[in-house]
């Protein structure tokens, strides 16, 4: 993991003193780091219709954004400095990049959102900004300078005239220069500004952090189909001198009690949160199997050497509660028996199989496991490994 090469800091120290609190530079955290793709291959992805990409052009105190997809010829006209290509969710298109997530496995996998990859020409940068999520910045080819400033929030003044959210008043108080294999952790809300010293690649591991409105929307969506219809508003004691059209304080208190009662439902909270955090970022990549298999057919295929891995767009999470194992996958929830030893082991394998082939040998003779596996395969959540 990222901290394995740093005797000066261990995982408990990082989690207690740095995570979501203050930045940390990890020099040579990934010794011998080799890029997963070339700048040309990244540009090729940016030419694809289904890939989210943009180019940011920068001159002193001025930025311009152009959104993809791009034509190949557009890259031939770019200068050798002062621009940055950013491509979202590259881990979905280049599954090998998911091996980076093994280096941050001390944070639950359902917190990871995606890996964005950027190529910056010399002097290229996207301006001072802040994110609402934590990020690990992994330097690949080249070198990049990062300046860090104060912590920001929703009230921080922004300049949005360029289409970017540029900080209007950025005063750096820390400066780091990252070389290949260096990693910089930046907590959510901390202002930062990157600029390429030498043209190169940066891998940004971002973490999903839904706001309260998203959490409430997810809860409400599930509650619509779950809460009983007779849980309704009722008047408090109506005063004889009540004024027509007035909403009284006692009425608001009655509504508050009703809403608090509706929210005090751990079952709904668990399911809505688990489904929200496993919603796929690119659901269009989750395509059902061309030929659906029966449990018996899957067993035969596995015995003949068929190998499966998680679809690069799949997201998994789980929660053990009482006799039930709540198994979340791509915004869906399955409740499995919690006392089933093999299912529990299969769940562990699925939750930890980031960027690798699943080891399904221990589960081939178990009917419950095969039933789950064939459903995941037919849904397109698991795919056949083509290596």
Can you name each region flagged by the protein language model?
Residues 265-349, 374, 385-387:
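Acidic, low-complexity/disordered tracts enriched in E/D and polar residues
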Residues 57-59, 271-274, 361:
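Short coil/turn segments at secondary-structure boundaries
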Residues 1, 21, 336-387:
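Long, charge-rich, low-complexity alpha-helical segments
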Residues 22-23, 196-199, 229-239, 324-326, ...:
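Short acidic (Asp/Glu) and glycine-rich catalytic loops that position anionic groups and cofactors
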Residues 1-17, 30-182, 190-232, 236-237:
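Active-site region of the double-stranded beta-helix
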Residues 224-298:
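C-terminal amphipathic alpha-helical segment
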